[in-house]
Amino acid sequence: GNTYSANNKQQTDIEQLMPKYNSTFAKMNGNYSYKLIWDDSMVSDALQEAKEQYSTNATFKIRRRKVFIKGDNATMEEKVEGALKYPVLRADKFLRRLLWFTHYACNGYYDTKGGHDVLTVACLYREIDYKNSHY
């Protein structure tokens, strides 16, 4: 018999965090909002970074993987905040040194496939040299 039939819903076990948790990422970077500009064009790069494909070009990066037990009833917002809180705090002196108008984006994914749930998040910060950019 085919054991996969009825239970094999066409639903993925991996949830991408953007765009749904954009405001959560912005909140976690809130101390630096005076100098940072969210850049939608970097969102897919941030996902690649979370997936450990390190080709992304960025001035500074934060990446964190956090494991949750199945049935953890924290909201996804709480999980994302919990995952980013300490990496952002630890990065404070680097984030403060970033140039004004640094572009940034975060992304990640929540994977429920294995015995535990795994949240992986990444934020990329890219300094933009406006002196040499032509519009």
UniProtKB/Swiss-Prot annotation:
Residues 1-5 form the signal peptide. It is found in: Secreted. Glycans are attached at residues 22, 31, 57, 73. It comes from the Eukaryota. Keywords: Glycoprotein, Secreted, Signal. One of its GO terms (cellular component) is extracellular region. This is 30 kDa antigenic glycoprotein. The lineage of its organism: Eukaryota, Metazoa, Ecdysozoa, Nematoda, Chromadorea.
